[in-house]
């Protein structure tokens, strides 16, 4: 593993009396796509929020390129790291252009108002997300995929090297899921952005991630390249699900086929669990 964009040292998180993450040590590789996986309630989203300083740790620390993030000025953090939470909502009537402009907040102060540089950053973000022709449309009039692209455009206008996204494909149909993940993959591939995501679809996580982090029992259960990490045993232990793990015929990445009930149109189906 190369340089780290973000890391944690004995990080502990919780709500009230509940411990969600316990003394977790994590390294997010710089310039790669990292995906958190795990069962519902395992702490994936909580961990992601803490990496963006949206949640105060009970113990330990989060380091942004080696610096304690808790000690950094808010605008300095916002120039280096952007986060898109799950299911964000925009005020009624807000246009795509107005939303994307919000990404320039870290660069504004009473001395420096809106500039040509800011407008150019917004235009680049709209172009990258293919929203130039929709800039004057209200965000709430867009389809689910278009709306999610508008929010991603806002994070792009922020011009950070690190982007965190909490379940960016939730509530999207298959076409729009691939559209969003392809966009993020392209940002990583062409601009070397560090992308950190929470995803529920294990097969899409395996396709797009360079680095997979499986979380269970408040800690990291396994991490590494998907092809090194994903086994039937891991899926059983992390998700309590029996499955067959094979190879994606298009991409060569791990493909998880869950056991269970359903129509069977092959003469013989061997539902055996093995690692």
From Swiss-Prot:
Disrupted gene: phenotype observed: Strains lacking this gene show a reduction in growth stimulation by the iron-hydroxamate siderophores schizokinen and arthrobactin compared to wild-type. They also show a reduction in growth stimulation by the catecholate siderophores enterobactin and bacillibactin.
Primary localization: membrane
Molecular function terms from GO: ATP binding; ATP hydrolysis activity
Induction: Induced by iron starvation, partially repressed by fur.
SMART domains found in the cross-reference section: AAA
InterPro entries: AAA+_ATPase, ABC_transporter-like_ATP-bd, ABC_transporter-like_CS, P-loop_NTPase, Siderophore_ABC-ATPase
A GO cellular component entry from the record: plasma membrane
Domain ABC transporter: 6-242
Keyword ATP-binding (UniProt): yes
The protein's role, per its UniProt record: Provides the ATPase subunit for at least 2 ABC transporter complexes; YfiYZ/YfhA/YusV involved in import of the iron-hydroxamate siderophores schizokinen, arthrobactin and corprogen, and FeuABC/YusV involved in import of the catecholate siderophores bacillibactin and enterobactin. Probably responsible for energy coupling to the transport system.
Protein name listed in UniProt: Probable siderophore transport system ATP-binding protein YusV
Organism, as annotated: Bacillus subtilis (strain 168)
